[in-house]
Amino acid sequence: MTIGWHFDNTYLELPKTFIEEIKPTPVHDPNLVILNKELARDLKLDFSNIDNKDLAKLFSGNVLPSDTCTIAQAYAGHQFGHFTMLGDGRAVLLGEHLVNNTKRFDIQFKGSGRTSFSRSGDGRAVLGPMLRNI
């Protein structure tokens, strides 16, 4: 699929304690619900020659762009007044998409399955809350 991805992944330069290389868990018969065409234009991506079935495979993580090295990230922060070790428990980063070789945009699949940072969940995400994020 040629849509204009230009991936880099500077996160791979971090010590291995900060990242886990992991592939998204496949989804059975994915469907495309919405495509943000304005964002695609801003990112210089062209989806016009790809049908919705192939886009669903791409955005579900069933098919990955060839120049990606997918990772989950470890991080920490304060949650409810306490320092907490956190991480991408249900998200996989494809990489940093470069626009005009100057701007970097993290491309991440949320709800793409368990990672070693998942606590007790299955790593999936319910559609409603994900749509509120856009």
Q: What is each of the regions a protein language model found here?
A:
Residues 1, 19-21, 46:
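Polar low-complexity intrinsically disordered regions
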Residues 13-17, 21, 27-35, 39:
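N-terminal alpha-helical transmembrane segments of multi-pass membrane transport
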Residues 29-32, 38-134:
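Conserved ATP-binding subdomain of kinase catalytic cores across diverse folds
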